A protein has these predicted regions:
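Transmembrane helical cores of multi-pass ion-transport proteins
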Residues: 1-427, 432, 530
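Short acidic-hydrophobic, aromatic-tinged amphipathic segments that line or gate anion-handling sites
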Residues: 534-550
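The feature marks cytosolic C-terminal regulatory regions of anion transporters and related permeases
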Residues: 365-534, 552-558
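Generic hydrophobic alpha-helical segments
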Residues: 86, 164, 467-471, 547, ...
Length: 558
């Protein structure tokens, strides 16, 4: 019996680990830690929490994902995809609500892994993924306009449309120096890769703009550039572990947000791991990765952190700088911890406009406009799912977008599946490719009073409706209906219900149903549903020639 393997990749790595591997991982871990720093701060603030919570998340989640994960090079931490969800949860349920929702999401992720749902999650329709990712990107960009241009607004509306109306009404309050810092930050981040692939543009922008803001304040008396320290009390103290008080009412109210965090985290982490596999030629264990992500999201909020997942940008940075084992991810977490302990107080000098610039670039990278445009050329059903998910994300929230998007995608999928199932009527002789030998061809003439139908494809509710319509189109009432099912791979509960109704209606009309060529799988499903109690075992035939013989016997008696 095959065992359920949830062994972390780290254990296999250590068997053949050597000094050369360590030196590569050390360099990659240091660079990824430096890259993760400004992103963790920016994601924390944009999510509505303090900057240190973003870094704490990167440390705790980054360490645990690398320690327990199913990917050798995955880097975990806070990501832009969670900004919208976290901000919405805090607004509605407060920080404690976010903590409980994140813990619940961690439990869900662990269950996903234990139930081996890792491969299934990968099947979430691509238009939904692109739709909500693009919607999140637009939302992140929208939330940064105030800080990017230094607008004077007491309270920014939460509604997307109202937010933009507010920005337009207050754009005259834009601060020149904040705008310069924000725009220059975007430019620096965008052009840095042209000069160096190793140095993260976001770090360069933060260093340059922080120094510039300090010089402008010191020597030019310009104090209008708001910094992190103006908005938050920055601390480098490691928070104590705090377990929130959970009530049944709170848990019930947070199921939907927690499930959204879990599903989004699962999608993003497995997508990141899959992309990384393609680059280094490896294969991750999806279920182990989900368990690791779950543990990370259980632990992170206990230290005051926020939801975390696998981060594609940091994972690719890890690969590009030589990281090939989980040790690189662990080193990245240690580097972040050292920076947090010794340099965190300096973060208070970072301009808010600069962080807004960092997030503008993040939102551009997330939007995936090329994929969006490409999908717009796909079938209308895909375009419908894409646009509905996209607009629901920016107008309402991600929870609604994913739920509605999945429902619509499922309905459209079922419609497509029903269209692939073909029901045809055989009028005179059965002489096409057959499941019997040519020697028995004389037995294949259809007797008077007998109708033969052949179903090709899965038999479920869509096919059942099609079948009923075809039968209703015949004016004459036969004595026997043979349903040939040799090409039916499976039948669902709706299909069984449809067949049951068909048998009962036919019996009332004096018509006998005979099944032919039922596969072992479908036979087992029908038997389990006690369908044969209605039909009768004598009306189940393994081949069409036997079904025709049975039909002749029934007709002769009537």
């Amino acid at each position: 019996m095959k065992t359920f393997d949830l062994k972390p990749q780290l254990f296999d790595t250590l068997k053949s680990y050597n000094k050369k591997n360590f030196m590569s991982d050390l360099m990659a871990g240091i660079i990824v830690g430096i890259v993760a720093l400004p992103l963790a701060i920016a994601f924390g603030i944009a999510s509505g929490v303090t900057p240190e919570k973003g870094i704490i998340t990167a440390i705790v989640a980054g360490f645990l994902v690398s320690l327990l994960g199913g990917s050798k090079i995955q880097i975990g931490g806070p990501t832009g995809a969670f900004i919208v969800i976290i901000y919405g949860i805090i607004q509605k349920y407060g920080i404690e609500g976010l903590t409980i929702a994140t813990i619940m999401a961690g439990v869900f992720l662990i269950l996903f892994g234990l139930l081996k749902l890792g491969t299934i999650i990968k099947y979430i329709p691509y238009p939904i993924v692109v739709g909500f990712t693009s919607g999140i990107a637009v939302t992140i960009f929208t939330t940064q306009i105030k800080d990017l241009f230094g607008l004077t607004i007491d309270s920014v509306p939460s509604d997307f449309v109202e937010k933009w109306i507010c920005y337009i009404q207050h754009f005259s309050t834009a601060d020149l120096w904040c705008s310069l810092v924000g725009v220059l930050s975007v430019i620096i981040i965008a052009i840095t890769p042209k000069f160096s692939k190793k140095i993260p543009g976001s770090l360069v922008a933060i260093i340059v703009m922080t120094i510039a803001a300090l010089l402008l304040k010191q020597y030019a008396g310009i104090t209008s550039i708001e910094t992190i320290g103006d908005r938050f009390n920055v601390s480098n103290a490691i928070p104590d572990v705090q377990v929130p008080v959970m009530t049944w009412e709170t848990i019930k109210s947070l199921v939907a947000p927690a499930m959204t965090i879990a599903v989004l985290g699962a999608i993003e982490s497995l997508l990141s791991a899959t992309v990384a596999d393609g680059v280094i030629g490896d294969h991750h264990n999806s279920n182990t990765e989900l368990v690791a992500q779950g543990v990370a999201n259980l632990a992170s909020p206990l230290f005051g952190g926020i939801p975390a997942t696998g981060a594609i940008a940091r994972t690719m940075t890890n690969i590009n700088n030589g990281g090939r084992t989980p040790i690189a991810g662990i080193i990245h977490a240690v580097v972040l911890l050292l920076i947090f302990l010794f340099f965190m107080p300096l973060a208070k000098y970072i301009p808010m406009a600069c962080l807004a610039g960092v997030l503008v670039i993040v939102s551009y990278g997330m939007c995936g406009w090329r994929s969006f445009v490409a999908l717009m050329k796909n079938p209308k059903s895909d375009v419908t799912v894409l646009l509905i998910t996209f607009f629901l994300t920016i107008i309402f929230d991600l929870t609604v977008a994913i739920e509605v998007g999945l429902i619509i995608a499922c309905l459209l999928f079922m419609k497509r599946m029903s269209e692939t199932t073909d029901v045809k009527v055989i009028m005179d002789e059965i002489n096409e490719e057959s499941d019997i030998s040519k020697g028995n061809i004389e037995h294949l003439t259809i007797p008077d009073g007998v109708e033969v139908y052949e179903i090709n494809g899965p038999y479920f509710f869509g096919a059942g409706n099609k079948f009923e319509e075809i039968m209703a189109s015949f004016g004459d009432r036969p004595k026997v209906r043979i349903i040939r099912m040799r090409k039916v791979p499976f039948v669902d509960s709706t299909g069984i219900h449809n067949l049951t109704n068909l048998c009962e209606m036919s019996k009332n009309e004096g018509i006998t149903i005979v099944l032919s060529g039922v596969s072992e799988k479908v036979h087992a499903q029908l038997q389990k549903a006690r369908f044969y109690d209605i039909l009768g075992e004598e009306n189940i035939c393994s081949h069409i020639n036997l079904a025709l013989e049975r039909a002749k016997e029934i007709v002769s008696k009537k």
